[in-house]
Amino acid sequence: MKCELLAEHNLALMLDFVDDENTKYDEAVLKAFLNEKNAYGYIAVDNGKAIGFAYGYVLNEPDGQKVYYLHAIDVVEGWQNQGYGTELVRFIHKHSKTLGCRKMFLHTYKHNASACRCYEKAGGICNAASDDIVFVFK
């Protein structure tokens, strides 16, 4: 398995990728995403097949520092709980450092034990005492 930045050369792999919400990806939309400033996509590939996908954004803070927000990560069922997600998160974290980000953050649910394990194994620190609540508007 290898992790890569999503780019023109591996874009076709995403057209067959189906995430846990059965999202189908459109080539034109993916190309537009690649052209967005501060937006990054990542792909995990095993035997020529996309088995994981993630994306996030560099956020500029008012003090001039940058942080990386990992918005979504998904590993195809059948490849989950085998370390692929952990490797993808490590790859993204390393990439965020090359972009000059002082930290990377993400949101997940406390009851999502497998995701929490993945992020902890990748080096993330869970602030279990935090009283943060994430509101989602659809």
What does each of the following model-derived ranges do?
Residues 1-65, 71, 89-90, 132:
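Acetyl-CoA-dependent GNAT
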Residues 69, 74, 105-107:
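Conserved beta-strand segments that form the floor/walls of ligand-binding pockets within enzyme
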Residues 76-78, 82, 110-111:
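Active-site acidic-Proline motif in GNAT/NAT acetyltransferases
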Residues 79, 83-91:
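Conserved acetyl-CoA pyrophosphate-binding loop and the N-cap/start of the following alpha-helix
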Residues 86, 110-133, 137:
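Conserved active-site alpha-helix within GNAT-family acetyltransferase domains
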Residues 96-107:
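Conserved GNAT acetyl-CoA-binding A-motif
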